[in-house]
Amino acid sequence: MKDAIKFVKKCEKCQKHAPLIHQHSEPYHSVVSPWPFARWGLDIIGKLPLAKPGKCFVLLATDYFTNWVEAESYSSVTTNDVISFIWKFIICRFGLPNSLTMDNGTQFNNLKVEGFCEMYGIRVNYSPVYHPQANGMAEATNKAVVGNMRRNLEDKKGAWLEELPKVLWAQRTTKKRVTDESPFALVFGTEAILPTEAGLPTLTTLFAENVEENQR
């Protein structure tokens, strides 16, 4: 931990882009999810530097149980984009959620989104647009994703779109303090084999090799 603190103090990008906390601490109010993918928080990141082909916003969804993140880039985020995102990235991948938490932005808080969610029995919770702490997990994830983007893209400006998959990969495979597990492990039941482990023996690869040998 001491080495990490020293590194961060000497890291120019960390000092420049890491968020400064000016708020007084408040009691922590946990948002409990009864099972994986039952409750999601949705939020919009942007406006980011313009990336080809004209993308400058990211719609982000965070599962409250596993911390798993889904994201898509847009030139602008419309109500139809939100509905399509919920269908494509949440329902079609993880099944119907019990509830969605969003802020009061016009893309979220409207009759179209409410009607779509009502059709599938999804409860919608709205948090004040100027009090995103009420949607705490999504806001914390946004800070992590945007912070990583800024640190990684300081000199690349509009290249954040190419970096988004890497940032999401890091978010999904990094252990979280609350669960002491990575979102990947909670979703798939095993840790991901990272690119840095290519060619190295891991518990997963050793187990797979052992199974293959026993099947011969």
Regions found by a protein language model. Give the residues of each.
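Short, contiguous acidic/charged loop-to-helix segments that flank catalytic cores in large enzymes
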Residues: 48-50, 73-78, 133, 155-158
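An active-site-proximal beta-strand-loop segment
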Residues: 36-69, 75
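Domain-scale segment recognizer with a strong primary affinity
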Residues: 11, 39, 68, 97, ...
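Active-site beta-loop-alpha junctions of metal-dependent nucleic acid enzymes
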Residues: 72-92
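Eukaryotic intrinsically disordered and solvent-exposed regulatory patches
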Residues: 26-29, 44-47, 55-57, 85-88
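Amphipathic alpha-helical
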Residues: 1-38
